């Protein structure tokens, strides 16, 4: 991108979408490779037989012997796109009907077909440089066109270049540079340094602000398309705050420590109910996406803890984020790391942590009779919940800048068991009958925000309206966004929704009726 492109596209985006001048990235830095040039690691298609790496390029190929009868898509597996710039080189060969494209902010349908925004590529020159909505609204902007789509779907077209002149800059037989920028509701396409299409999409029903990246191999006569030097740069979210939700690997059994299912459920609720929030989930451990945190306003970690905590190999990386003001939150076992350097980091990030031989992790019924006045408690009524509520956390000295959010008095029986790293210890026994904090908010001296929450053992607890709302509120608060006066709205998830995405198969003796009765009791 650079001077010419920034001046043109910057003016287009600012004029059409009301962005501040600083919203468009002004530096080349920040692009990271997402294809290693050697393997298809991190890329996957339903039928991999058409895809390979040749001459350092991802290659999609159809032949007379192995034709493509329906469009094929190679999907990047390591993350999704929201606001971004993508740069790559492409080359296409075959007959004049050879066609391809780059899918962005798209979805994968059940049949493996990828639907959504497509930066078009073809050999004949009819579609190259256009923006198409695959399996959707069809052509959005032809080459040389700027399209504004109103909220009711009506379109206004303006010429931004001559299609033939723009086609003349495309190398029919050689490599071409494709540069795709998506910021807010706007998408801009550029080939070989020239803007070919601009779309500003205000159609809330049909537009997408996030989704997958995929490469297309079109059905038809034999052809080949190649992609190389694929680089991604995430942009600060336009009129949104972003929380990156890191889910740890599978852990206990069905319905417990369901990191993936829990975060996928809550992220869906945030994205559906908070237009100013973008929640992105990375499942099964620390993200392999090298750009995962580049435009994050907050990071929320739900995982097993101790020495196996997902952050243990990424302490310095996470600390750099915190020092930039990125919010940090840890949930359930995720509040525990080893004492020493890891524990000190959590004290810096969230104001407290589970320290072995100091804190304890019993299961008990916590009754939260009174809630403090805080954005995280907005719309939340006093409630009770049986959970593995860890307590007696190690907090920063004098609990400076820490606000207790959930406080209850544990049964004395939870303090008596043994003398070990997680059970009873003299420190907790000295506090018989005293209140303990099991969730807290932290306002860091650097301006960032932290949150710790020790509940979340049982996946079904997300069906408790007050339990769930408090956590949703916390995920918004740590981004720096304003929590609505009545908290984050969301519908009580159904049993089918709760059972989705779990790590383990459902046991034969699973009692759905018992869970449904608990949910009704929580929300009566």
Predicted segments with their positions:
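Catalytic beta-strand/loop cores that center a nucleophilic Ser/Cys/Thr
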Residues: 357-446
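Carbohydrate-interacting regions of secretory-pathway proteins
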Residues: 24-238, 346, 352-353, 360, ...
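Bacterial N-terminal signal peptides
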Residues: 7-20
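Solvent-exposed loop/turn segments at secondary-structure junctions
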Residues: 65-66, 91-96, 108-110, 124-127, ...
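Positively charged n-region of N-terminal signal peptides that target proteins for export
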Residues: 1-6
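A glycine-rich, often tryptophan-bearing local segment used as a flexible ligand/cofactor-contacting loop or short
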Residues: 308-382
């Amino acid at each position: 991108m650079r001077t010419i492109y920034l001046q043109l596209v910057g003016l287009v985006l600012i004029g059409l979408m009301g962005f501040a001048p600083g919203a468009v990235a002004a530096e080349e830095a920040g692009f990271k490779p997402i294809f290693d040039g050697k393997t298809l690691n991190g890329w996957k298609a339903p039928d991999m037989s058409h895809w390979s790496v040749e001459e350092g390029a991802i290659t999609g190929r159809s032949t007379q012997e192995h034709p493509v009868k329906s469009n094929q898509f190679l999907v990047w597996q390591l993350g999704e796109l929201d606001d971004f710039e993508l740069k790559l080189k492409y080359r296409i060969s075959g007959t004049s009907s050879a066609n391809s494209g780059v899918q962005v902010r798209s979805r994968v349908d059940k049949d493996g077909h990828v639907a959504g925004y497509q930066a078009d590529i073809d050999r004949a020159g009819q579609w190259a440089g256009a923006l198409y909505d695959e399996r959707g609204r069809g052509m959005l902007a032809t080459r040389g066109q700027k399209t504004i789509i109103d909220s009711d779907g009506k379109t206004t077209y303006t010429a931004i270049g001559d299609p033939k002149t723009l086609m003349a800059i495309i190398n029919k037989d050689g490599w071409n540079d494709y540069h795709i920028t998506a910021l807010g509701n706007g998408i801009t396409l550029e080939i070989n340094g020239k803007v070919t299409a601009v779309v500003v999409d205000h159609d809330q029903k049909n537009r997408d602000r996030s989704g997958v990246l995929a490469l297309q191999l079109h059905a038809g006569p034999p052809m080949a398309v190649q992609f190389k030097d694929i680089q991604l740069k995430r942009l600060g979210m336009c009129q949104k705050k972003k929380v990156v939700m890191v889910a740890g690997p599978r852990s206990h059994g069905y319905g417990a420590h369901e990191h993936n299912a829990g975060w996928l459920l809550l992220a869906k609720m945030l994205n559906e109910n908070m237009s100013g929030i973008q929640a992105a989930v990375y499942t099964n451990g620390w993200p392999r996406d090298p750009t995962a945190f580049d435009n994050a306003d907050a990071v929320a970690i739900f995982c097993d803890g101790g020495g196996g905590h997902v952050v243990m190999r990424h302490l310095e990386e996470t600390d750099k984020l915190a020092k930039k003001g990125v919010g940090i939150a840890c949930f359930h076992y995720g509040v525990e790391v080893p004492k020493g350097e890891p524990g000190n980091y959590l004290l810096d990030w969230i104001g407290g942590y589970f320290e072995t031989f100091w804190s304890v992790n019993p299961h008990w019924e916590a009754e939260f009779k009174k809630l403090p006045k805080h954005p995280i408690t907005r719309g939340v009524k006093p409630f009770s919940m049986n959970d593995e509520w860890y307590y007696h956390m190690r907090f920063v000295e004098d609990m400076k800048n820490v606000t207790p959010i959930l406080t209850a008095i544990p049964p004395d029986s939870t303090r008596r068991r043994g003398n070990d790293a997680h059970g009873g210890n003299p420190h907790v026994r000295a506090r018989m009958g005293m209140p303990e904090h099991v969730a807290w908010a932290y306002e860091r001296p650097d301006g960032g925000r932290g949150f710790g929450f020790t509940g979340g053992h049982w996946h079904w607890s997300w069906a408790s309206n007050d339990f769930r709302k408090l956590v949703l509120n916390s995920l918004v608060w740590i981004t720096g966004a304003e929590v609505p006066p009545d908290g984050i709205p969301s519908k009580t998830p159904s049993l089918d929704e709760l059972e989705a995405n779990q790590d383990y198969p459902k046991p034969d003796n699973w009692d759905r009726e018992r869970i449904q009765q608990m949910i009704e009791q929580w929300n009566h």
